[in-house]
Structure formats: C-alpha cells, structure tokens
Curated annotation (Swiss-Prot):
The UniProt record lists the keyword NADP: no
Encoding gene, per UniProt annotation: kcmf-1
Top-level taxon of the source organism: Eukaryota
Annotated Gene Ontology cellular component terms: nucleus; plasma membrane; synapse
PANTHER family in the record: E3 UBIQUITIN-PROTEIN LIGASE KCMF1 (PTHR12268:SF13)
Residue numbers binding Zn(2+) 2: 29, 32, 59, 63
Keyword Transmembrane: no
Catalytic reaction equation(s): S-ubiquitinyl-[E2 ubiquitin-conjugating enzyme]-L-cysteine + [acceptor protein]-L-lysine = [E2 ubiquitin-conjugating enzyme]-L-cysteine + N(6)-ubiquitinyl-[acceptor protein]-L-lysine
Positions that bind Zn(2+) 1: 14, 17, 38, 41
GO molecular function: DNA binding; zinc ion binding
Official protein name in the record: E3 ubiquitin-protein ligase kcmf-1
Highest classification ranks of the organism: Eukaryota, Metazoa, Ecdysozoa, Nematoda, Chromadorea
Annotated stretches, region: Disordered: 277-306, 530-575
Length: 575
C-alpha cells in the first residue's frame, strides 16, 4: 500500500497542469462540476485545454473559487485551536458561490445565503460546506440549484448541534447572601432526609458524635453554641435568659413573626450589637452639634485674637548700621515702602549670628582704573595671579547626564546623518584650509630669499623659520615708531599723452618714505605721491634757476618762429 505524501491533496488533479496529488493550496470552482487548480495555475491563470461539452459550462475567471489548505498548512495556521480538526472539516473560511464574498464562517455563511440569496439565480452551484465536510466530500451529487433550501434542509440542524456542543458552558457565579437574623419556623420549610427523619435530628446525631470525641473545654463551647443557635426556637428556657442577661442592662427587642399562621406564642429574640462611641464622652448634654450663633461668636473671637496679636507686634525698625549703609540707602530710593517692609521682615525672621566683616572676602571689589598707554605697553594679568575678578559668579546648573537622551546616541538612524554631516563639514573645512595655505605659500615665495623646502610634512614651521629668517619676525623693535599723519597731497598738472606722445605710467616709490607710507596704509600700492618731502630746498632752487634760463631761450625761439610763420602768406600768391 502506497503511503500518501504529507501535505498533498490525494485523489485530486490540477485541470491546468494535469499534476496529480499536488502540494500547497487547492482552489475548487463552485460553478463547474469538477474543476480544481493548483496555486501556480491559479496565480498564472492557466486554465488548461477546455473542451465544449453539452450542458457543461466552460470555466471562467469570474467563477468563485474555494480555497482548501493542505493538512500541513492547516495545522500551522490553526495550531493550538481545539475546535479545528482537519479530519472533520478542512475548510474554515467559506466563499459564497453567488457573489464571491470570502472569509465567512459556518454561521455567517448560512445567514448570508438565507438573507441575500433566498431565491435561486437559475444555475446550479456547489455547496462549500459539503466540500469541507470529510464525510460528504465523496458524495457524487454536490451541486444544488437552490442553496438556501439546501442549507435549511441539510446543514441547518447539523450546524445548530455543532454550535451547541462547541459553545463553552457558562455557569452563574455563586453569590453569597449575607447572613440575616434567624427567624422562627416557617410553614413548609421543614426538610426531611431520605429516611424520613427531620434534618434537625440528623444534625443532632452528628453533633452528639462530635461531642463524644472532643475534650471537656471544647464540649462546653459547643454546648453553648448549640444553645445559642436554638434560642429562637426555645424562648422560655433558662439558657436564653442567661444569654440575654449577659448583654447588660440593654433593653430586649422582641419582634413577632410576620407569618400569619405561625404560633403567636413564639417570639423572635434579636441581640442588640455593642456600640463603640467615636468621640469621647462628655459631661454636659449639649449634643454633637454646636449652635450657629455660638460658632459665629467663636470665629469672631479668634479673628479678634489674631488682630490683637498683630497690634501687639513691635514695628520693624532699621538698625543704625543698616541706616548708614550706602547700598541700603540707594535701594530704598528705588523700591516701594511695602518692599522695604518685606525685606526688613525677612531680615528679621532670618537673623543670624553676626560675623566679622574683615574675615569675609567681599563679593565685588572695584578694580583700580589704569591709564592706557600705547597698545604695545599694555599688559594684562589673569584673575588668578593678580587682583580678583571684577564680578566672580557661581552658577548651579542641572547635570548634563540628567537632561541627556541615551536613546538618541544609540539609534543608528540619527548617528548616520550626524556622521555624514560631520564628514561634509570636515571636507569643507579642509578645502578652506588648503586655499588659505596656497595663498600663504604664494606670499612666502614672494617675500623669501629662497623657496622653502618642506622635508618633514609634520613640521612645516622649521622650513618657514629658515626661509623667513632675514625678516626677523620674532624680534621686537627697540623703539616704537611714532605714528605720523599723512600730509596733504599737491595736485600736479597732468601730462597729456597726446601732445607729449608718451604713455602715462605709474611708477611706485620704493624709497624708505614711500615704503613706510605703503605699509601704514595711507597711500595705495603703486601710486606715486605728487609731493615728496625728500626734495630739499637747495635742489628746488637749482631746478627753479635752470627752468628760468631755459624758459627765456624758448621764448626767443618761439618769437622767431612766429615771425617766419607770419611772412609765409605774403610770399605765396594765389592766382
């Protein structure tokens, strides 16, 4: 005998791929008589070769399909549910063969069919409950023309029995009624045992057997308890009198039975409970409540006492030392009188032992003002070495650990953007540093005697120090140069390049005076000062004398040329 494979649909073949005993999900058509598809053919819409046969419709994509799980998948899905058994019912979620609604339970399916499809639409369908039931799976006639009638005749009674058997048994919770005072015998309440003896006789026999097996002390306690329980039934005996007298001088409350046919001589005795006073007893008989006028007078007397105490208090006065304090005088001029009284009250209530003023370090001491000299001669000292700071402060803040968020630093979603942002900032800062380095190297090459050679990249300052050694950058001048204001510039006549035939060229002044002006920033680089103080008076006189003699000769030559020019038009005759 061949053992069927676990998790396969035995005896079923796929009409799409013709594979027998396939595994996985099985899809059963609820319109066609015998049409099944595997999971692969259902998802790819492989419906196989269908031949047109009389009275047999061809399968269409719109036909409702019922999902049937394999045994392995069923156990995995409904594991731990004692009401689901694959051997009894292999379908849990049903599909309507009319409107193709899925996800219906047995009860929901029946309600849906009876309410939505009471009349047959005119074609036969397959009942999904018959397919899911193992006992009805191999029945030949599974098709029905009226599903509502089929449900009422076949499945309704079976489903009711199934629901009744699977529903959990609900029991009412036991409610303990409070024990009330026992009353007398009621009519028709006396119970008898199976042998015909009263129930009290059985209890008495059991009680007697219990008394024989117990000690003398316990016997006495049980006997007293028995007498107490039988007091309502025997009101005239001696035990009831003893019990009532033990309660003191309290009056006995006797309540007659409400039953009309009961013996009128039988009375019910109720033992009053002992009361414990909440408040201690008082000698007077005024009662618990206080009259309203008395209460009002008491409140008024308390208010009067408070006012009297306030009047008796001595007024707040200032001490002699406080009156002479300059800070207190200034403070009084800036705040109101109420604030002054409040401060005095606070100072009076929080008085402390007077301490020596000399032993305490002042909070604020004014630093003596120093006259500022040149910027190079001003020296600063730290507060720890020299005089104390002008305003030392002490801040009390919350620790950073208490306000931090630990989850933020452990979450990778936040750390990754921070890392990327940090890398971008580092890259941008490196680029800026390289640009500045190139500019610095260009300046160094222009000002150094020879180009520095950086043999060790980690120590570039050594090469720079050797290259810039002639500039003496680290040495301070023995005497500071005094600042001199720039002199007014004299406008010199401009030379016309058209008349002179020369291009105007700006020649920088490389003299000591010009270099100083360029460094100080008074004159832009490359601009020649139009008036230079380096020209001495003697040179000016020589230049002036030479210019005067030369000017006379030039004037004579110009006069001769003018006379010649004037004689030219007389000699030329124009006919």
């Amino acid at each position: 005998m061949v053992t069927p494979l676990t998790g396969t649909h035995e005896g079923v073949s796929c009409d799409g791929c013709a594979f027998t005993a396939f595994a996985g999900n099985r899809y059963k058509c609820l319109r066609c008589s015998d049409y099944d598809l595997c999971f692969s053919c259902f998802t790819t819409k492989n419906y196989g070769d269908q031949q047109t046969i009389a009275d047999i419709p061809i399968h269409d994509e719109s036909h409702p399909m019922q999902l049937i799980l394999s045994s392995v998948d069923f156990d995995l899905v409904y594991q731990g549910d004692p009401t689901r058994h694959y051997d009894e019912r292999k379908i849990v979620s049903f599909t309507c063969p009319y409107c193709n609604i899925t996800g219906l339970t047995e009860r929901q399916f029946g309600t849906h069919v009876l309410s939505q499809h009471p009349e047959a639409p005119g074609y036969s369908v397959i009942c999904p409950l018959c397919i899911g039931n193992t006992e009805m799976e191999h029945i030949q006639s599974k098709e029905t023309e009226n599903l509502s009638v089929h449900w009422t005749e076949i499945h309704l009674h079976t489903m009711e029995n199934l629901f009744r058997s699977t529903e959990p048994i609900t029991t009412r919770p036991v409610q303990r009624r409070p024990m009330l005072a026992r009353r007398g015998n009621r009519a028709g309440v006396s119970r008898t045992a199976a042998q015909g003896r009263p129930l009290q006789d059985e209890i008495g026999a059991e009680m007697a057997a219990l008394l024989r097996n117990m000690g003398p002390d316990s016997v006495e306690d049980i006997r007293r308890f028995t007498e107490m329980m039988t007091v309502p039934l025997l009101p005239g005996i001696r035990s009831s009198q003893r019990l009532m007298t033990s309660t003191g001088d309290r009056p006995t409350v006797v309540v007659e039975s409400a039953v009309t046919h009961q013996d009128p001589n039988v009375q019910q005795v109720i033992r009053p409970l002992a009361t414990i006073p909440i408040y201690p007893p008082t000698s007077d008989e005024s009662g618990d409540e206080t009259p309203q006028p008395a209460a009002d007078s008491a409140d008024e007397s308390e208010d009067d006492n408070d006012i009297q105490e306030l009047d008796d208090m001595q007024p707040i006065v200032e001490d002699e030392a406080l009156k002479k304090d300059e800070f207190w005088k200034t403070l009084k001029t800036r705040i109101s009188e109420e604030d002054v009284d409040l401060i005095l009250e606070t100072m009076k209530s929080t008085a402390k032992v007077k301490e020596d003023i000399d032993d305490k370090m002042p909070v604020w001491t004014q630093r003596p003002l120093k006259r500022l000299a040149n910027a190079a001669q001003v020296t600063t000292t730290s507060d720890s070495e020299g005089d104390p700071g002008w305003l030392p402060l002490s801040f009390e803040t919350t620790p950073i650990r208490s306000t931090g968020c630990g989850g933020y630093w452990s979450d990778k979603r936040f750390l990754r953007p921070r890392k990327m942002q940090r890398e971008q900032s580092v890259a941008s800062s490196n680029a800026e540093i390289m640009e500045k380095a190139e500019i610095a190297l260009a300046l160094i090459r222009a000002s150094c005697l020879h180009e520095p050679v950086f043999t060790d990249p980690t120590k570039p300052d050594i090469a720079l120090k050797e290259a810039l050694q002639h500039l003496r950058l680290g040495e301070k001048p023995a005497k500071m140069m005094e600042y001199q204001a720039a002199e007014e510039l004299v406008n010199m006549p401009e030379r016309d390049p058209i008349t002179t035939g020369e291009m105007e060229v700006e020649i920088p002044d490389f003299t000591a005076r010009g270099y100083g002006q360029i460094v100080d920033g008074n004159i832009p680089l490359g601009v020649v000062p139009e008036a230079d103080e380096a020209i001495t008076n003697s040179e000016d006189e020589e230049i002036v004398g030479g210019e005067t003699s030369g000017d006379d000769e030039d004037e004579q030559e110009d006069d001769e040329n003018d006379s010649q020019d004037s004689s030219v038009p007389e000699e030329i005759n124009i006919d």
